Amino acid sequence: MEEIIRVENLTHTYGEGTPFCRSAVQDMSLAIYRGEFLGIIGHTGSGKSTLIQHLNGLLKPTSGRILLGGEDIWADPKKIRNVRFRVGLVFQYPEYQLFEETVYRDIAFGPTNMGLSKDEIDRRVRESAHFAGLTDDLLEKSPFALSGGQKRRAAIAGVIAMEPDVLILDEPTAGLDPAGRESILKNIRDYQAAQQAAVVMVSHSMEEIASNVDRLIVMEKGTAVMTGAPSEVFSHAAELVSMGLNVPCMTQVLLRLQQLGVNVPASAYT
């Protein structure tokens, strides 16, 4: 697989040199590959959000490097803007970031700042709206007139419109009903398949992680303590619980059956 991002010995310390100094990520290394769906889980404060904000240069490492396509993203700080076009980050509750007069203009904001032609911007707006599950009739509406789920889709479309090589999502389904969650995840998978993009998803929903990701990283105290396929990671249920994490409901049932002497596969998790 083609490696698209490499994190080398990343450390990030907040408030360095002050009494409030706190290490959020410690000497962490990982690789992200084109076309893969990577999940990141960890208890609150484990360093997940700090890590993903380094991947597109929103935070600068205290030490270590972030390589995009083999090049250090901070080698030339003047080019960091281009990194953010290639690595799109969707924050938790991104609908609060909508600000334009129409949904169309909001989605077009990123492509416009890339200096693209009007025709190319129009193509990207409409295609990204389609990927995000928005119909054409919504594009001329005010984003503030949309439902909560539609706002979430518009915000995701605004990042997808830049056609990033890597799409990073922090709790993309938070606050949505079950149908809305599954619909959003399907849209993300559709984009990944069409663009062969890497997708990185942070989530507290173990069911969503188990059902969607190819590879999973477990973070604790600022570093990766477990990495592997979901079947491999969730087979260590006791360790995950000791970190304050849940495991998928089906995994809990199967583990209990194993404890009762029933022969069930340890790798089943959904």
Region spans (language model):
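Catalytic Walker B motif of ABC-type/P-loop ATPase nucleotide-binding domains
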Residues: L167-D170
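Conserved ABC ATPase signature
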Residues: S142-L146, Q150
